[in-house]
Amino acid sequence: MDEEVKLLGSWLSPMSRRVEVGLKLKGVSFEFSDLDVFFSKPPELLQHNPVHKKIPVLLHHGKPIAESLIILEYIDETWPNSGIRLLPKDPYERAMARFWAKFFDDKCSLTLWMSCWTEGDKQQQTLAESKLNLTTMEGALKGKKFFGGDEIGIVDIIVFCSVYWAEIAQEVVGVDVINEDKHPILCKWMKETVDSKVLKDYMPPREKLFCHFQTYKDAIAALMNARFGSN
C-alpha cells in the first residue's frame, strides 16, 4: 500500500462495514483487522479507542480516528479526488447529508437492532419508534434514486448497511420491523440498490450472516435484554 491505512473492525458489524464500503468506493487500499469485540475488548481496540472502546477505528499513518460517520467524512476529505464523493460538493446538500446521516444514527440504528433482539414492552416500544423514524427517513428519499439524488453517498451507505443487517435479523427472530406495506419507499430503494450491486457487492454473504444470527440468537438476545431490559 502507498499509505498506511488500517481498519479495526468486525465482519459482523454494520458500523464497521460502513467504513469498509467507504474506503472501497474511494479506491483506498487498506488492511482489515477483524476483531472479536462482542464478548470482550481486544487490547488493540483499547489501545486505539480508549474512550469509547468501540469499533470501527481507522488508523492512518498510525493515528486513530473513531466513530463511523467521522471516519467516513475523514476518508472523503483525505482522498477528495479518488473514487466517488461520499458527501456532496454543494454546501447546502452537504449539510443535509450530514443531517440525515446523524438523524439515522441517533434515531434508527439502535432501535432497529433493539426491535429485533429485545423482548416485551421494550421491543414494542422500539418497534413503534423504528416505524416512525424510518417513515421520516423515507421523506428524505421520496422522489429520488438515492438519498443524495442521482449518486450514492454517505446516507445511502449507512442506511443500507443497517437495513441489510436488520432484514436478516428480523427473519431469524420472526419480527416484522421492515416491510413493503410499512415502508414502500425504503424497500423499493433497498431492492433497486441491491439489484444495482453498487453496495450489495460489499456486503457479507446473506447466508453467512443468517447462519451466525441463527446460531447465536439466544446469546445476542440475552446480551441485548441484559443491557436494555425487556420492560
Can you describe what each PLM-predicted range is?
Residues 1-147, 151, 187, 218-231:
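GST-like domain detector, emphasizing the conserved glutathione-binding G-site
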Residues 76-80, 105, 142, 163, ...:
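Hydrophobic/aromatic-lined pockets within catalytic cores
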Residues 36, 154, 206:
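Short, solvent-exposed turn/loop segments enriched in Gly/Ser/Thr/Pro and often Arg
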Residues 87, 176-180:
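Membrane interface segments of multi-pass transport proteins and intramembrane proteases
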Residues 135-136, 163-168, 189-231:
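Non-globular targeting/processing and membrane-anchoring segments
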Residues 149-173, 181-188, 193, 203:
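GST superfamily/GST-like fold recognition
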Residues 100-103, 115, 160, 205-209:
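Short acidic/histidine-centered micro-motifs embedded in hydrophobic/aromatic stretches
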